[in-house]
Amino acid sequence: MPELSESIAAVREGAKEDTFTYLTILQYHANTPGILPTLNEVLQDADLTREIGWDLVWTLIPIAGCEDCLETVARLGNPREVIIKVMEALNALSRLGESQDEIDDDEEEDDASRSTAKPSSVPNRIITLIGMLAILQRRIKTKHPSRFLGPSLVSVLDAYQPTPEVTTAVINLVRSLSGRRRPPLPQRTSSIDVANPDEHGDISKNAPDPEAELEDDEEVNLNCRLLQSFTTCVLQRYVNEHEMQWSPRLLELYYPDKIVPGRPTVTKAFREDEVLLKRDAVVGQLVALLRDLGINDCSISFVRGVVCQPSNTDPLAHLDKLNSVDDISLSQGGTASLVAYWIFSTDAFSSDNPNPELHIFPDHLDMMKLFLGSEPKDEISRNPGVADALLAIGLGLHHRGLLTTTDDRHYMMYHHYLTLIAVFHPNIQVRNAATRFAGTILHSDPDDESRRDILEDLLANCSFPSLNACAISWLQEEIITAHNDGISNVFASPETIERLQHDLFPDARDAATMDGDTFLDYWGENQTFFLQAASFAYFLFNGRKDLVPVGMGASLEQRFVEPLTIAATKLGKSKGLDGYGSMQLDLFIDRLASLDIH
């Protein structure tokens, strides 16, 4: 590696050589620690940078501290050539992804021993390139700037890593390109500061576009729509990567009496944790940006026009066919997240947002149906943030009393979609919120027979014991409500228990003959359901015998109580469970033993 003095001389004197020779010299000396300020001085020669600038993007971007040099390249290089190199570099970074950080760490250790310049991390490279795009895109004066803007945004989206810093750089980019500049906000502990050369740099240094043309009148609308679409895509990716937990927070807000005293809440965590505060701040900035871009409409026509149409997972994928604003769609997941944020921030922060004109039936049901599709588990796994957003929308609509505008209410289908989120969502807080909301929706169904059908479907056809247990709990709540309110419905007579008894208390006679390991697995899979079933049996036989069908006690004892008592007792003696597991097993045995069956 050459000495700094040697590199300084080479960079200064080499500019007199032909372009190819000088680029070769720069490639050799660019990694010398301390050389970049000298190179930036040389690049102030506009004629030189116009000739070689685009070739320097690849050379400089891996080097930490290259930002000033590349800003100069963006201001003085040929904008149409440099922007192509920037897009190529972003595409290359999109293929590297997160794994490159490990490579960079190894390179840093090796380079330290060779006294070379420190490599730049992938996120920092992306931020630098995004800053260059903001300058370049505004320098290009062409009849159809959307033909540069569209591919540039696709390149950024492909390389985008949803960190707060990269997202802030994206926000700065869109603000620069939209021409809308907000006054600086007061600094907060959750603020994120990244380089923004287009806003903070010297615009007077920008060289003119050597191929300038007058812009077509239609381009303003096209460019705005591209920025809207791009920003909704970024919003979707950000909330999918970072748990916003809107639905659990709304649940705590709407039902404060359900909060267990002394237990930490999600709301409190988002008020106090620095990382979570920053997370909220970034999403708030994205939403504010969309408002600046003209999206401030929560009408039925707007939301249904985006979210209730056939799925369009990549709205920026077909820019080669772009002819009009109508050819550019918004991200469906991003739009759902936007609506969820409007509802959440209105209720949680008293923010001034558009009021939703949607209803659960049919609007939100259609949104859920389109999102979950035929592969709900995969869809929720790929888009956990969107699933949380959809759940938050449902909670907000229900809280506002916006249930339906039609007599066609598919409570069972809607309830089914909620239970899918309750089962498949990776975050337990969101799963719990979905479960709670599913119970609320069930009890909201005005048709008692429809409510019973939903419960029967869950008990008979659902393969998830946790949901089977929920169905039993909801059934008990229906029975208690009918009794307390003096209502004469299907939950006030033995007919419902007669109809559901074999799903409530399935045949478990095989359990008595299972070996220890087999029953241990069986118990582990079904423990939640068995405990709830035993509790419900106690509720019936020791309190509401008027609902117990004739002859049910003997049948229940034979097929459910006796075999499970035998198997559970053997498991307890085998010491195959930990302390908490043993306590749950003992509770189950005691509950079965205390049933007043005879």
Task: Show where each model-derived region lies.
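Acidic, Ser/Thr- and Gly/Pro-rich intrinsically disordered linkers and low-complexity segments
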Residues: V86-S121, S190-N196, D202-P210, M244-V275, ...
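Short coil/turn segments at helix-helix junctions and helix-capping linkers
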Residues: Q161, K377-V386, L418-N432, I441-D447, ...
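Core helices of alpha-solenoid repeat scaffolds
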Residues: L4, K16-T19, T32-L39, C66, ...
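Long amphipathic alpha-helical scaffold regions
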Residues: M1-G262
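Eukaryote-biased recognition of C-terminal alpha-helical segments
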Residues: F437, P563-H598
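Residue-level signature of the C-terminal ends
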Residues: G14, H29, V42-A46, I63, ...
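Extended HEAT/HEAT-like alpha-solenoid repeat tracts in very large eukaryotic scaffold/adaptor proteins
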Residues: G53-L56, P62-C66, P79-V86, S113-L136, ...
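HEAT-repeat alpha-solenoid elements in large eukaryotic scaffold proteins
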Residues: A15-K16, I35, R125-L133, L173, ...
